[in-house]
């Protein structure tokens, strides 16, 4: 007796459910999209603007840029008490290291200028002799000296991250 095709057809053992596709939940897609979007935004911030746009903010009016800080000075020699009280906040007397750099770069020693600068001494009367860059305190600083006010400018953490990333990638 010949077999019919319907007798040998596949028959499931029980009532089946439609096959389920493996899917990520919507929250996972939102999370992945947020991460990818954040990476793209940070990459655009790092790569698109020029290095100049990540520079330090300009010094205030009447101040001059010096390294990572701003300086202002009075060409009249004065006593320590006047010098300390003459710098407007957030400025203070120039730190010793910055004063040495400024003296070396500017070669400011002249017949009309004072031979000393007042420098920041954390409450101690401190000065810097311009001729040789030697610093001293108290009785070493007897004569009037020039007041140079200084305030530092520092880039924020994100700017440091951007500039170091650009340096690592060799970008201008």
Swiss-Prot record:
Keywords, comma-separated and alphabetical: Membrane, Signal-anchor, Transmembrane, Transmembrane helix, Viral envelope protein, Virion
Residue ranges of the TM segments: 28-48
Classification via Pfam families: UL45
Name of the protein in its database record: Envelope protein UL45
GO terms under cellular component: membrane; viral envelope; virion membrane
Family that this chain belongs to: Belongs to the herpesviridae HHV-1 UL45 family.
Ranges per topology, Intravirion: 1-27
UniProt-annotated location(s): Virion membrane
Membrane-side (Virion surface) residue stretches: 49-172
Record-annotated disulphide pairs: none
Membrane-protein topology: Single-pass type II membrane protein
Taxonomic superkingdom: Viruses
Cited function: Important virulence factor of HSV neurotropism. Seems to be required for glycoprotein B-induced fusion. Dispensable for growth in vitro.
Lineage of the organism: Viruses, Duplodnaviria, Heunggongvirae, Peploviricota, Herviviricetes
Keyword Magnesium: no
């Amino acid at each position: 007796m010949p077999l019919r095709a319907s007798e040998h057809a596949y028959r499931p053992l029980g009532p089946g459910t439609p096959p389920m596709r493996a899917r990520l939940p919507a929250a996972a897609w939102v999370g992945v999209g947020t991460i990818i979007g954040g990476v793209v935004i940070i990459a655009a911030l790092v790569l698109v603007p020029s290095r100049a746009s990540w520079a330090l903010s300009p010094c205030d009016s009447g101040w001059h840029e010096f390294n990572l800080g701003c300086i202002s000075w009075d060409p009249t020699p004065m006593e320590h008490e006047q010098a300390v009280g003459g710098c407007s906040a957030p400025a203070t007397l120039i730190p010793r290291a910055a004063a040495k750099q400024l003296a070396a770069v500017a070669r400011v020693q002249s017949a009309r200028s004072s031979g000393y600068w007042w420098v920041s001494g954390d409450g101690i009367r401190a000065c810097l002799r311009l001729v040789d860059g030697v610093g001293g305190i108290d009785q070493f600083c007897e004569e009037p000296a020039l007041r140079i006010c200084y305030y530092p400018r520092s880039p924020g953490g994100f700017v440091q991250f951007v500039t170091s990333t650009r340096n690592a990638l060799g970008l201008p």
